[in-house]
């Protein structure tokens, strides 16, 4: 009997959050181990399907860095990185487009199997993500200048769940590879999303990354600005994205451990949450 009561309590705990976030846009940046491990992948798809089916409006932006690197190696296309960003010449950009399209359609298939009306897009579709070149040294890596959010708003209105591959184009129809974190942040800002969640390979934001007891469960925007200069590496970039999002219309940003099963549900629908909440 006790285990049934515990299950009931879980549902009761989730109820106020389901009510609070009903019809709200939730932007999920999907990447890291949660994309590479089949069991974790299935858990993430279940979480997102449940978010959709209880009335939230999720949108997925996915990465694919390791798969792109593997395909480049297989095809003999040289991979080069500068400051953590892939240098994308025309050959690399073509490989990235191919790999991301394949990942995108697999995600659509997974969510369709869970009863969700999912639709796959890349940033070139309908000029969803309009770009300019980020840096001459990075070749076809783009910075988003405009998100044509009307496309996404209409899809959400028709009960679709958009899944977006981070490929964009410029005014001359050149194709650009876009950092998936940047794409997720730009789309969340354009839609003034209720939440932006980054699935990562870390438990969240640490005050001192070498001290695993320094995990920050919640941090205000002002505190995040003070902490940002003290953080190094990839998490510094991610925290800057969190600050940018919160300053431009996104209510809350979450840094979650994608290696934990059902981390999205644990963060959104429980009192304690998991990971770091910014904002």
Swiss-Prot record:
It comes from the Bacteria. Its EC number is 2.7.2.8. Keywords: Amino-acid biosynthesis, Arginine biosynthesis, ATP-binding, Cytoplasm, Kinase, Nucleotide-binding, Transferase. It is found in: Cytoplasm. It catalyses: N-acetyl-L-glutamate + ATP = N-acetyl-L-glutamyl 5-phosphate + ADP. The record marks 29, 238 as: Transition state stabilizer. GO terms for cellular component: cytoplasm. GO terms for biological process: arginine biosynthetic process via ornithine; L-arginine biosynthetic process. The keyword NAD does not apply. Pathway: Amino-acid biosynthesis; L-arginine biosynthesis; N(2)-acetyl-L-ornithine from L-glutamate: step 2/4. One of its GO terms (molecular function) is acetylglutamate kinase activity. Catalyzes the ATP-dependent phosphorylation of N-acetyl-L-glutamate. This is Acetylglutamate kinase. It comes from Campylobacter jejuni subsp. jejuni serotype O:23/36 (strain 81-176). The gene is argB.
